[in-house]
Regions:
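Cysteine-clustered segments with highest specificity for TGF-beta superfamily mature ligands
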Residues: 20-79, 87, 166-188
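Short acidic, S/G/P-rich loop/turn micro-motifs used as interaction or catalytic elements
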Residues: 12, 70-71, 141-142
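Helix-biased "structured C-terminal domain" signature
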Residues: 35, 45, 84-188
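Short beta-strand segments
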Residues: 8-9, 66, 91
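Solvent-exposed N-terminal domain segments of exported/luminal and surface proteins
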Residues: 1-22
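A short beta-strand-loop element at or near the start of a globular domain
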Residues: 1-6, 65, 115-120
Length: 188
């Protein structure tokens, strides 16, 4: 059964689009995020938004997202920096699954060409039988912006070790292009 369902969306521009459509019904953001990436003296503003849509998600199904407006002009277009995307994060429970602690951390942080170090807390870890998973929702991620910049590759590391999901999309390197616009885990 669905315990919680969270809709995240965002894109390029300083005008936050806080009203979108999920499966034909309007959704209004309850939280928004903004961040600016500076590249060579040019500021690239981005926004993100969140809404709890648990009441609209009852189980497996197809979901359609529309109505997102982003800046596709200057300065984003000239630098291949236009971004738009959405993700539905669903937390479910089942008597056949073992008990798990679920932590959802959100925000918006640009990091191209620089390292972004996060130290999430609040985890409860058993002494044995550790079976952790991580999911990341990211904007951008096209191959043109996935090459190393300033000696920093697009990769996800845990305690210094680059993570590889073992899924190799043709033309990508999962260790160096972690944000390659793919869904890298099986859907349950």
């Amino acid at each position: 059964s669905v315990v919680a369902a969270y809709l995240y969306w965002g894109g390029s521009g300083s005008a936050i689009d806080s009203n979108v459509v999920l499966n034909g019904s309007g959704v209004i953001a309850s939280r928004t995020f903004t961040a600016t990436f500076n590249n060579g003296g040019t500021n690239f503003p981005y926004f993100g938004a969140f809404a709890d849509v648990t009441s609209r998600v009852s189980g497996n199904g197809s979901f359609t997202f529309t109505g997102l407006t982003v800046n596709t002009g200057t300065p984003h277009c000239g630098s291949s920096a236009v971004a738009a995307g959405w993700s539905l994060v669903v937390i479910y429970g089942s008597p056949s699954e073992r008990l798990r602690a679920i932590n959802v951390f959100d925000g918006l942080e640009p990091f191209r060409g620089s390292a972004l170090n996060l130290a999430p807390d609040g985890f409860r870890v058993p002494a044995t039988g550790i079976d952790g998973r991580i999911a990341v929702v990211a904007l951008e991620g096209d191959p043109d912006n996935s090459t190393p910049l300033n000696g920093v590759s697009e990769e996800l590391r845990f305690n210094g070790t680059a993570l590889d999901d073992g899924i190799n999309v043709p033309g990508s390197n999962p260790l160096l292009q972690f944000l390659s616009t793919t869904i890298n885990m099986p859907v349950h």
